[in-house]
């Protein structure tokens, strides 16, 4: 079957983990593995397909993405706020544009981060070597400005649990920034966070990491707010 036209959205009865809902907004806990909106290669099974089944007449933005004012990566789990009215959409969009919203994530990264807290700054843009990745350009000659504040919550021998607060919202910001400082996200295949096993000869360590990958078979990133 041919995929539907890009602006033809089909309602699908997809179970949604609704955290909060009133007359103006709905907050959904998106599972890892779910794409937020239809696009090339993903024409069904997205969060938007489920939303338009749950709610009629969601407001649309210029990109024909009903209710959406922000998004998170397919393999990132966590909270998304969706506008149910035109007023809410305009208001929320302005808050994201003005950076007055608080966007907090939890991440597990490889290695032990020395500082208890810190800030990662550096422009983020499309990688010249791999177009599926974003790179950090600290000199500011390419990309767009990006700022990530982090705080260590717990050090766990091989990995560190961190809380990240975004001052900007660039594509793959947390993933690219932490790779840049040498602490790739746990099991982040696109940025090499799954390559820790390659060349490892310590069998017990190798088995431990493989067990961890089995428990969390995707990048360790969750949108808390």
Feature map (PLM): residue ranges:
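Short, basic/low-complexity N-terminal boundary segments at the transition from targeting/disordered tails
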Residues: 4, 131, 203-207
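Charge-rich, low-complexity amphipathic helices
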Residues: 73, 114, 142, 172, ...
């Amino acid at each position: 079957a041919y995929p539907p036209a890009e602006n033809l959205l089909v309602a699908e009865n997809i179970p949604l983990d609704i955290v909060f809902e009133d007359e103006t907004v709905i907050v959904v806990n998106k599972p890892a593995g779910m794409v937020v909106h239809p696009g090339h290669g993903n024409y069904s099974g997205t969060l938007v397909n489920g939303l338009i089944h749950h709610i009629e007449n969601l407001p649309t933005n210029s990109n024909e993405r009903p209710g959406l004012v922000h998004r998170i990566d397919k393999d990132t789990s966590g909270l998304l706020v969706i506008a149910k009215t035109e007023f809410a959409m305009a208001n929320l969009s302005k808050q994201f544009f003005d950076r007055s919203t608080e966007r907090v994530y939890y991440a597990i990264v490889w290695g032990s981060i020395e500082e208890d807290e810190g800030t990662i700054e550096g422009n983020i843009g499309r990688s010249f070597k791999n177009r599926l990745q974003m790179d950090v350009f600290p000199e500011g000659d390419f990309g767009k400005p990006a700022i990530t504040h982090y705080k260590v919550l717990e050090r766990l021998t091989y990995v560190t649990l961190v809380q990240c607060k975004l001052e900007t919202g660039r594509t793959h910001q947390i993933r690219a920034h932490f790779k840049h400082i040498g602490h790739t996200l746990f099991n982040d295949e696109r940025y090499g966070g799954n390559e820790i096993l390659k060349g490892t000869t310590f069998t017990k360590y190798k088995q431990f990491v493989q067990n961890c990958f089995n428990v969390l078979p995707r990048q360790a990133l969750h949108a808390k707010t």
